Amino acid sequence: MKILAYCVRPDEIDSFKNFSEKYGHTVDLIPDSFGPNVAHLAKGYDGISILGNDTCNREALEKIKDCGIKYLATRTAGVNNIDFDAAKEFGINVANVPAYSPNSVSEFTVGLALSLTRKIPFALKRVELNNFALGGLIGVELRNLTLGVIGTGRIGLKVIEGFSGFGMKKMIGYDIFENEKAKEYIEYKSLDEVYKEADIITLHAPLTDDNYHMIGKESIAKMKDGVFIINAARGALIDSEALIEGLKSGKIAGAALDSYEYEQGVFHNNKMNEIMKDDTLERLKSFPNVVITPHLGFYTDEAVSNMVEITLMNLQEFELKGTCKNQRVCK
């Protein structure tokens, strides 16, 4: 298959070279993020590959349809940037990478929890200013805390296994689909019970219409005073304005955001010399007890390699069978 890969980072190039040969593809790589303005570049190709922050709206999909594109493979698990109704209408088959390295996100989540509970980022900022005092840096020990995991699939399970080594006081979780393996470590509770009982709440659920802004004013009010919130899943699971109010009131002791609801066009881009227009993000950055990372929980050498390989495997399967096990939209 002849493929155009958009938004290719330098760290992906070797994997594309190696796996394109393995799966019999001809792949051209460009750094441009996919969107309506560059969709015309797909002319002459059979399929394209994109990333999760690319703009895959109706306009862009119609343009690649006019270019003859039948297959679209995102190198991510998340697909919230893709207009599925338009893809189906235009006969474009879509596939994703449902699991590239659950360990990468789970390890990062544990790191975020330690960063919050031990105030590591705040301490680092103070040291940069030659402030070596201990005042304001006292932390809490994980073994005295209850962990609440929302979403216990592949990544959530690895998160649970990772925290189990710290001897947490208790581990509880919520998922509409209970994981039998997770039951070896956690007790399943209702969502309200997780909000009420957990000292650390970590999110590992996909974004759906039903859980949009699940962490909002009402749910935060149900939480313990001094709760820590971690989001290494999808940004729009959290209502950012409600989060800010919770931080200002002291209800929330700290938040770690590797995903942010308005991250598209910002995360994974260098904005150092630009005036930031997102006042909400700027307010979140101003809190000393908020850790923001640019959606890099997935970002390990193994995960990047797997993302590229599974993407090219998906496109090979489309070419040979007309369908794919990781297909998200049927023609």
Swiss-Prot record:
Disruption phenotype: Mutants are deficient in reductive metabolism of phenylalanine, tyrosine and tryptophan, and exhibit growth defects when cultured with amino acids as the sole carbon source.
Signal keyword on record: no
Recorded catalytic activity of this chain's protein: (R)-3-phenyllactate + NAD(+) = 3-phenylpyruvate + NADH + H(+); (2R)-2-hydroxy-3-(4-hydroxyphenyl)propanoate + NAD(+) = 3-(4-hydroxyphenyl)pyruvate + NADH + H(+); 3-(indol-3-yl)lactate + NAD(+) = indole-3-pyruvate + NADH + H(+)
PROSITE patterns: D_2_HYDROXYACID_DH_1 (PS00065), D_2_HYDROXYACID_DH_2 (PS00670), D_2_HYDROXYACID_DH_3 (PS00671)
Pfam families: 2-Hacid_dh, 2-Hacid_dh_C
Sites where the protein binds NAD(+): 154-155, 175, 205-206, 211, 232-234, 258
Family annotation (SUPFAM superfamilies): Formate/glycerate dehydrogenase catalytic domain-like, NAD(P)-binding Rossmann-fold domains
pH dependence: Optimum pH is 7.0 for indolepyruvate reduction. Optimum pH is 8.5 for indolelactate oxidation.
Keyword list, A-Z: NAD, Oxidoreductase, Phenylalanine catabolism, Tryptophan catabolism, Tyrosine catabolism
Gene3D superfamilies listed in its UniProt record: NAD(P)-binding Rossmann-like Domain
InterPro entries membership: D-isomer_2_OHA_DH_cat_dom, D-isomer_DH_CS, D-isomer_DH_CS1, D-isomer_DH_NAD-bd, NAD(P)-bd_dom_sf
Enzyme nomenclature, EC number: 1.1.1.110
Active site residues of this protein: 234, 263, 295 (proton donor)
Pathway given in the UniProt record: Amino-acid degradation
GO biological process, one term: L-phenylalanine catabolic process
Entry GO MF terms: 4-phosphoerythronate dehydrogenase activity; D-lactate dehydrogenase activity; hydroxyphenylpyruvate reductase activity; indolelactate dehydrogenase (NAD+) activity; NAD binding; phenyllactate dehydrogenase (NAD+) activity
PANTHER family: 2-HYDROXYACID DEHYDROGENASE HOMOLOG 1-RELATED
Similarity remark: Belongs to the D-isomer specific 2-hydroxyacid dehydrogenase family.
Function in brief: Essential for the reductive metabolism of L-phenylalanine, L-tyrosine and L-tryptophan. Catalyzes the conversion of phenylpyruvic acid to phenyllactic acid, 4-hydroxy-phenylpyruvic acid to 4-hydroxy-phenyllactic acid, and indolepyruvic acid to indolelactic acid.
Protein name: Aromatic 2-oxoacid reductase
Taxonomic source organism: Clostridium sporogenes (strain ATCC 15579)
